[in-house]
From Swiss-Prot:
Gene Ontology CC: one annotated term: cytoplasm
Family to which this protein belongs: Belongs to the DnaJ family.
Native organism: Prochlorococcus marinus (strain SARG / CCMP1375 / SS120)
CXXCXGXG motif repeat start-end pairs: 145-152, 162-169, 188-195, 202-209
Binding site for Zn(2+) 1: 145, 148, 202, 205
Name recorded for this polypeptide: Chaperone protein DnaJ
Cofactor note: Binds 2 Zn(2+) ions per monomer.
Highest taxon of source: Bacteria
């Protein structure tokens, strides 16, 4: 006899929800009314036996300790009269079936229904994501036929009640299962669940009640969006069947990377190169930001890899564009690989000056100075 956990495809530590999900999935797959393959019915019974034990905490504890021997012959197909929460599972499975305790047919689908939602992927520039922009897009979607107004019937005519289902949109058939007799409810094959048939179709839409058209839309992209941001455009999805309301359009954004700027949440990061003299003496330079060229103060004594902050020059907060992040600028100090004779003389004098100030400054040929005093020879 197969292990009950293996039968359900779960590990021995599986919780009640995992067991229930596994059982529902397998019961759907192997139900005799759905799966006509040889052995499906026997497999269905094994699945039922496994869940009947593992779904009961007391029986599961005995099974975990003693195996099937600890069940005392109690493991078997569940009794419909003593199923407890087990019956709820079957009510979920067979929402299209009627049977003991069943409420019967599903909600009918006659009349207008809402149309499907649509997805549109839009790529935008870095600065467009920062500050927002209005963009024009073209989408193909279904619109209600303006000739038949969604009925699908030729003007002057109309749909008639389906003779197969009597307008219910559903048909039933009795089915016997290991759990007793059930009434399976399915869409009517004649009217496809609408409860109505069209004898004389609209020539404009071919009886569909909808037509595919390409439509121009102007999309407002708010400031602060990022890759993965989803914008909802109400009522711009597909038109619903039989004159039903349209679904929605969802625009998914992808933001192009910037050549020099990098986004990190609400902050922007970039780098700037300065000379060793600018780092030592300080300077005022101009840097690129999303707001355009901006003045940046380089403090005297700036160290390599120092990060200077431009407040409120980052990304606006989505939904509250007044609040912005910062622009963080990493400073790269460039050491010249070649010096002119005049530069070398001046720096040598500076090195001598520092050497005279104390022993700690004596080894001027190492570190910064060793990099400055490279030979000018080619």
């Amino acid at each position: 006899m197969a292990d009950f956990y293996d039968t359900l495809g779960v590990n021995r530590n599986a919780d009640a929800d995992s067991l229930k999900r596994a059982y529902r999935r397998l019961a759907r797959q192997y139900h005799p009314d759905i799966n006509k393959e040889a052995g499906a019915e026997e497999r269905f019974k094994e699945i039922g036996r496994a869940y009947e034990v593992l779904g009961d905490p007391e029986k599961r504890a005995r099974y975990d300790q003693f195996g099937e021997a600890g069940l005392g012959g109690s493991a078997g197909m569940p009794d419909m009269g003593d199923m407890g929460g087990f019956a709820d599972i079957f009510e979920t499975f067979f929402s299209g079936f009627g049977g003991p305790g069943s409420s019967g047919a599903r909600t009918q689908r006659r009349g207008p229904q809402q149309g499907d939602d649509l997805r549109y992927d839009l790529t935008i520039d870095f600065n467009q994501a920062v500050f927002g922009q209005e963009r024009e897009i073209k989408i193909p979607h279904l619109e209600t036929c303006d000739v038949c107004r969604g009925t699908g019937a030729k003007p002057g005519t109309g749909p008639t009640t389906c003779s197969t289902c009597g307008g219910a949109g559903q048909v039933r058939r009795a089915t016997r299962t290991p759990f007793g007799s059930f009434t399976q409810v399915s869409d009517c094959p004649t009217c496809s669940g609408s409860g109505q048939v069209i004898s004389d179709s609209c020539q404009s839409c071919g009886g569909q009640g909808v037509k595919q058209v390409r439509k121009k839309l102007r999309i407002n992209i708010p400031a602060g969006v990022d890759t993965g941001t989803r914008l909802r455009v109400s009522g711009e999805g597909n038109a619903g069947p039989r004159g039903g309301p349209s679904g929605d359009l969802y625009v998914f954004l992808k933001v192009k990377s910037h050549a020099r700027l990098k986004r990190d949440g609400l902050n922007i990061h970039s780098e700037v190169n300065v000379s060793y003299l600018q780092a030592i003496l300080g300077d005022t330079i101009e840097v690129d930001t999303v707001d355009g060229p901006t003045t940046l103060q380089i403090p005297s004594g700036t160290q390599p890899s120092a990060v200077l902050i431009l407040d409120n020059k980052g990304i606006p907060k989505l939904g509250n564009p007044v609040a912005r992040g910062n622009h963080c600028i990493s400073v790269n100090i460039k050491i010249p690989s070649r010096l002119t004779d005049d530069e070398k003389i001046l720096l040598e004098k500076l090195a001598i000056y520092y050497s005279a100030k104390g022993p700690q400054n004596h080894h001027h040929n190492s570190g910064l100075f060793s990099r400055l005093f490279k030979s000018n020879a080619s």
